[in-house]
Structure formats: structure tokens, C-alpha cells
């Protein structure tokens, strides 16, 4: 377990490891020269728990890699795991991993990690497809998708395997050190046992005064660190002749990292965007055609636009393509030979894959206008044609779900029929009952489009930005008398809704608005 200036959480992390039971021979807590009393707190715990050993570093290492290496050096048990001071191990995690490793004589055992949003407690599984069922992988090249899970903390490693292959973390100030460590593990071709059990809880504190590395993406240094770590990981795999894994890693970069940062580009300043674009182009130029072809279409398109354009462009449209699910908003251009293309002036970025892509994967664009009103709330949807595919499928109906983002539950469900309009457009309108929402919250608008040919597409609506649309409106509430509702656009441009029930909620928003005006 490693920690630095995390006195508020370190005891919970240590206790979660000790609570795993007799399978845990020793917990080695490496304090990276904390200044907030974390070291003394750990010493106090160690005085009462013989299985806890505390290592005090004399100088701060600047990263997570060096203290983890210290732990590897001190480990005397046959197996080792890693834990961060602000996370926890759920009950039974070690037993699940250790049991699989022993039963299958595996050098590495891995299980499911969940990202737990705090304070809401909402959990999102990390790479759940890998851990849907128990399995044994004789060598990683037989399952290239393993490169998608770059985490080091949801795995148990045989200590002699790490030492025999000299597998360590990058030392010093090296962000995304787990990218490199995981590549070194996979390059050593371990026998791996995968379990469906949840073995790690990754705490996500978006409101924290100091953001974690994975959340602190505002500066260009974070993106450069990610590029450097990914480049080094790919080089490690290629040096070990793991070409399939290297290709899968590059394809995953396009689908995950590139899409994630592209969704946030229009939140940054002009200088950041220009710098980001230049650095990203330089890295993507090291990819070959097969790397792009191996990636899912949205990331492939985003990457090709960046390569084709010397300067940042079309950021709002790129953001929508990078969304999950992807949305390709107008205009819909063609190359001179009639091939669908990103734009008339970038005909080399072809979109011909859209002509044969299954409807359930087609990045259809649906504009959404949510209008909260005292006499009833209406959601108007406008479905766009996409190179003839939508008309051929025949839009019929749309299911609209209002989903509680905190708990992932559907609180309202509506269905409406599409009506054809001129210019290859279809519209549908549903009524939503906002008065039934009984607490402050954030609500996602999710759609399922049904077509005459029997196909369907799950989608989100593009939040239309026009005067009077994305603003706060007070509407009646059966529970609280009044409800403050605000439709808004998420980072990816999708339509969502925030609510603040009751007079107190309205007053809070009014005070915040007044404070902003005064400052």
C-alpha cells in the first residue's frame, strides 16, 4: 500500500487489506515522505497489528512507481498485490485471486475493478468484458484485449515472477506508471487466471481539493505524460515480439484515450488546443494503417481528422463523434467520387464504413430540445438522415428513458412515434413529468430508436444550444411545491437535466448566482 499526504483515507485502505484474513501474510505500507501525519498514523496502526509493516521514505519520490518498487523489494510472501491509500479492497478479494492463482498455477491473477463515485456511491465496472466469467489465459497474446486493462491494482502477482523478469515500475515522477508496468507484465508472457469477482474499489473523488492523476487532465503535461507512457508501453511489447498486443494497445489508445480527451477539447483554451493537436498528430504519425483499422470507428475517425488537419478544427463535431454512444452531426459531405467524407475540404477522411455499418452501431444524430414548463415539460427530438441509411431502415418509434445518474435506474419511460419531415428529417415529442422527481439529482436522457426493418439503435440526444433552451426554470413539484430544472449539455454534448427541489434548492441557486455577479 502506498500513500502520500492522505491521512484522511490511509487507515481505511490498510484496514481493508488486513480484513482480507489469514491469506494476507503482511501489509507493507510505504509512506512517501508525507507531511500531514500519515506516517505517524500508520505507525500507530502497526503498533496494534503485527501484520502491518511501515516503510518511511526519507524523500518524496514524486510518483507512485518508486514506493511500489520499495514494496516489491520488501515483500517476503509468495504473492504480491498493490493498493493505493485512497482506495480499498472489498471483502474476499484476496481469496478470489489467490484461489485462482493456486488452482491454475498462474503467475498472475486478475479480477474486476469498480470505480466508485464519491459521495454518491455509484459504481462503474472497469473493463467488465474481460471479467465476465472465470477463465485461464495460457499467454496474453491469445487474448489481446488484456491490454485494455492497464491497471496494476486489480491483480495478484507471483513475487518470483516479477523478480525473475525484472518487472518494476518506472521510478520518480512518472505519471501513468501502471501503463508501463502492465506492458512489462504482459511482455513476460505469464499464465493468467481471470475471475469475475470484484477485487478492487477505485474511489473517484471529483470534488476533492487535490484531484487524482486520472482526473487532473486540465494541463497539457497530463496528456504528454499519457502519450509518453503509452509510447513506452507499445515499445516494450514490440521489443518482446508481441505485435498483436502492440496493435491492440494502439487501437485501444484511439478508442479510449483519444476519445476521452477529444470530448474535453472545447473546454480548454486556444493555446492548449493547439499544443494538444500538435503533440497528438506527432504521436499518431507513428501508427500504421492496420493500427487504425483495428480500432472502433469513432476513435479511428477522430484520429484521421487530426492527422489530416494541421490546426485544430471541427471541435464541437469531433466531441460528438468521441461520445459514447457516438453521434455524427451534420453536415454530411461527400468526396468528389461520391464517397461519404468528413467534409468537402478533407475528402481523404472517408466515412464509407457508414454505408455498411449495422444500424445498432451507426452514429445517428438526434437533436434534443427539453423545455421545462409549469404546464408540462416537453422533449422534442429531431432525427437526421445519415447517407441514406436512416431512411432505408425506416424510423418508427423512439423510447425515451430518464435515468438517475447516481444509481443508474430509469425513473421515467416514454414512447413516441416518429413523423417524417421534409429534408430527410424525422421528429418525435414526448411529455415528461418533472414534478415527480423528488430529490436533487442529475438525470440522463437515453434513447432507443426503433426502425421498420426490425433494427434499433441506442443513442443520446445532442443538446441543442439556442436562446432560452439550456436555462433554469421553476416548475411545480408534487413533493416540494417547486422544482428548479435545468437542461444542460454534458462534456460530450449530450442532453441531460439537473434538478434542485424545493424552495431551499431554488434559494441556493439564487444565492450562488448573486455571488457570481458580485465577484
Please identify what each model-predicted range represents.
Residues 267-519:
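Basic, ligand-binding patches in group-transfer machinery
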Residues 7, 263-267:
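Short acidic, S/G/P-rich loop/turn micro-motifs used as interaction or catalytic elements
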Residues 255-263, 303-308:
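Short, hydrophobic/amphipathic alpha-helical patches that form generic packing surfaces
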Residues 182, 230, 250-254:
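Short runs of predominantly hydrophobic/aromatic residues within well-ordered alpha helices
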Residues 245-259:
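Amphipathic alpha-helical protein-interaction segments enriched in hydrophobic
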Residues 17, 21, 46, 230-237, ...:
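Hydrophobic, Leu/Ile/Phe/Ala-enriched alpha-helical segments that form helix-helix packing faces
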Residues 197-205, 211-244, 257, 267-287:
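Catalytic core of nucleotide-sugar-dependent glycosyltransferases
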Residues 1-224:
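Nucleotide-sugar donor-binding/catalytic module of glycosyltransferases
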